[in-house]
Amino acid sequence: MAEGQSPENSPPSPTPPSPSSSDNQQQSSPPPSDSSSPSPPAPPPPDDSSNGSPQPPSSDSQSPPSPQGNNNNDGNNGNNNNDNNNNNNGNNNNDNNNGNNKDNNNNGNNNNGNNNNGNDNNGNNNNGNNNDNNNQNNGGGSNNRSPPPPSRNSDRNSPSPPRALAPPRSSGGGSNSSGNNEPNTAAIVGIVAGAGLLFLVMILFCVCCCRKKKKKHQMPYYAGNGYATGKGDQYQQQQYNNQSDHVMNLSQQYPGSNGNNNWMNSPPPPPPGSWQPSPPPPPPPVSGGMNGNSSDFSSNYSGPHGPSVPPPHPSVALGFNKSTFTYDELAAATQGFSQSRLLGQGGFGYVHKGILPNGKEIAVKSLKAGSGQGEREFQAEVDIISRVHHRFLVSLVGYCIAGGQRMLVYEFLPNDTLEFHLHGKSGKVLDWPTRLKIALGSAKGLAYLHEDCHPRIIHRDIKASNILLDESFEAKVADFGLAKLSQDNVTHVSTRIMGTFGYLAPEYASSGKLTDRSDVFSFGVMLLELVTGRRPVDLTGEMEDSLVDWARPICLNAAQDGDYSELVDPRLENQYEPHEMAQMVACAAAAVRHSARRRPKMSQIVRALEGDATLDDLSEGGKAGQSSFLGRGSSSDYDSSTYSADMKKFRKVALDSHEYGASSEYGNTSEYGLDPSSSSSEEIRRGGANNNKTTPSRDH
């Protein structure tokens, strides 16, 4: 509006107020109404309004932002029109106010127009002569209507107010920027955490791989030495391998050496012994150190993979299998292979009981020096037994090759052998449940050799003296010294007649033809021993026939009428289960059939003894139309005369070759008190003198 268009109630020519009045008017708050009121400014409340509220003039939409109290236009003595005010926007700092703008920094007191300089402009502006100017300078309506900070309008129109309002704007902007940065910071933290977690997972994976490699290096010690064939951990079933008797070996009694020899098993025990990981067949002779020093033990123990296979705690039963002993260690354990420690002797040598420094008992089978036959058996036993681990089989726990000395080390079982309890001086009679348990356990062990080993293993020396018993009378099949690895397509393994007379199958005794059914025949003879309590061959000469010849017709009659009284051991006093007796008699009769093809497999015998198969299932080994029990009536079967002729021929061969009984480890010196079945050579001599030439046997 023009200069002369002031409100009617406004004074026509406002005189410049005194400095004091101007101060009071400057401090007065603008009128409450939005319109430019003509009323003179009433004395407002005290100074706190002017100092405390920088009335932003921005909310008055019709007028541009006030010049922020810098009404310093040239010659505008209280008549600041709109145009001048518009021109003064942004010129708040000019020098046209004649030094009146010394207090330009009004700290946001934009609307009062009182620069506290006492100039004419201040007085004119405070009198409200210019409505628009008052609206802009005094912020009459804007002061009441604009609680928000002088934001948008003042920012656009005047550069200096933004300076006063800069802190709020910058703070608002800062809050926005910080809000935008928060997600970025969280994302960065998440990425870093994920990368760290991935790194930890990779480290754990590498550690697991390293441990697996170390475990693999432990087994090569045995596998690389020809001990393990991948049949599983050789040391996981040591709890079952508590057997140690018969060990075919020479008894060269050498002066005992000092007793502080340590066994490979004892982790740090004093006696040194060398525990070398070298394979048994060609291992180098035991190196120095037979003096029993712990240093020798540690040096020999280290081997290629020694540290990776720490010796087990002494409480573990004999620890590792197939460990190398020094001769001095075994001599010390057996008190110099003294007679008091002699368990038995046989064609290969002697068996001595030994006690290791850690208190464990062992049985040491030593081979006769210079016995080529014994050396061959030693090689076979070390190679085969080390590959076999089963609950019902004996495991080789150590060996010794020192120059010409070759010895096998087994766990010692204090419960002796089946032969001892059946025919020895134990003074106790095995009850029927124990006999059945022994039969079942030995059948499972032999079935494992025949059907679960690859290549399969034929024992070739099944007999009562090779069935060891633990404290609970669990059976353990022992002495694989005669066993040979037999490929499926190879049946003629050896012409050397091994084994014990009375247990040999007819076809094997006559021709040396070897199959798993030869072991079945020997097992059938052992079952007859359990049932009858008789030996395979009568050593007294009172019974001309063998146990098999005597029992065959009785088994047939018992199967027909169910009367087993003539067959059963009288010491049992008829204390047995009839159906269990029928099962065992049927298994024995089927196993000793003349025809090898008609004998059942060991797995079939196991099922029959457990009661899981009918007796007719035992005939599955034969051809259709043949007798299901004893195999009679078939032209392919041996008759009694043929079998007897074969036995006579075998007796003559055994006498001439002196190989009979070579596999037996117990002789007259056996602690069992009686000659074992293998020592029936005297009976052979008695009967062999009367034998005539026999026709060659036929195996159809």
Swiss-Prot record:
Mostly expressed in flower buds. Coiled coil: none annotated. The lineage of its organism: Eukaryota, Viridiplantae, Streptophyta, Embryophyta, Tracheophyta. Keywords: ATP-binding, Cell membrane, Glycoprotein, Kinase, Membrane, Nucleotide-binding, Phosphoprotein, Receptor, Serine/threonine-protein kinase, Transferase, Transmembrane, Transmembrane helix. It comes from the Eukaryota. It comes from Arabidopsis thaliana. This is Putative proline-rich receptor-like protein kinase PERK6. It is a single-pass membrane protein. It is found in: Cell membrane. GO terms for molecular function: ATP binding; protein serine kinase activity; protein serine/threonine kinase activity.
